[in-house]
């Protein structure tokens, strides 16, 4: 059984790519057709590639891999933080600071500063300092927390990265490439897939699509580390019945029929 059924992908709008004038020709192999000036992603391929990504992430997690989730666009911020945390991993969901990976030692000094400020806030140090100084220190703490809070406890450089919209996260992609860190990513029709090790062709702008796929990558990590029985039950709620229903329906329908059926609800 597929990790995510065709029905679930359709309901989340995973199949909607970008306008045809904003495409990367290298994504042609993942595009099914064009509708009203918008590319439609071939979900039959997406289903298989999600399975491949899930198995890859699960296998890496079983080896104890450190995984960094990256998604700084508004549609991804909440899902990236929530799912990385649920999987016991790390995340960057606001601006990517240049050198986060390639200048790791310097980033560590900023993380130490963040931890120091947190300690000052809890041990009473702020209570004895002038209000103006405390205000400045709190602003510094908030800024560091915003950009580095998700990697504050990351023990080392990541072994794998999961990225939502690698086109937007170009700096992160290039840093990972320099350090030979494998990338699993949601890749839309306007993105170069050659930069990604494990491609998931997908709409990367819809909140539901981002949450659906990000949650499955988190599930893979949980399963790889703890065993299938330990995966949070809520993540699989209704999945088996939906998948069975979805597979049965899609077995008798072409991709074009499916696109036509849902197009009215998603446009």
From Swiss-Prot:
Q: Where is the composition biased (Basic and acidic residues)?
A: 225-251
User: In the UniProt record, does the keyword Transferase occur?
Assistant: no
Q: Carries keyword Phosphoprotein?
A: no
**Which UniProt key words apply to this protein?**
Ribonucleoprotein, Ribosomal protein
Q: Where is this region: Disordered?
A: 224-267
GO BP annotations of the record are: translation
SUPFAM superfamilies reported in the protein's UniProt record: Ribosomal protein S2
Extract the InterPro entries matched here: Ribosomal_uS2 (IPR001865), Ribosomal_uS2_bac/mit/plastid (IPR005706), Ribosomal_uS2_CS (IPR018130), Ribosomal_uS2_flav_dom_sf (IPR023591)
- What Gene Ontology cellular component terms go with this record? cytosolic small ribosomal subunit
An example of a GO molecular function for this protein is: structural constituent of ribosome
Among PANTHER family, the record links this protein to: 30S RIBOSOMAL PROTEIN S2 PROKARYOTIC AND ORGANELLAR, SMALL RIBOSOMAL SUBUNIT PROTEIN US2M
Q: Which family does it belong to?
A: Belongs to the universal ribosomal protein uS2 family.
HAMAP family per UniProt:
Ribosomal_uS2_B
This one is known as Small ribosomal subunit protein uS2
Source organism per UniProt: Levilactobacillus brevis (strain ATCC 367 / BCRC 12310 / CIP 105137 / JCM 1170 / LMG 11437 / NCIMB 947 / NCTC 947) (Lactobacillus brevis)
Highest lineage ranks of the organism?
Bacteria, Bacillati, Bacillota, Bacilli, Lactobacillales
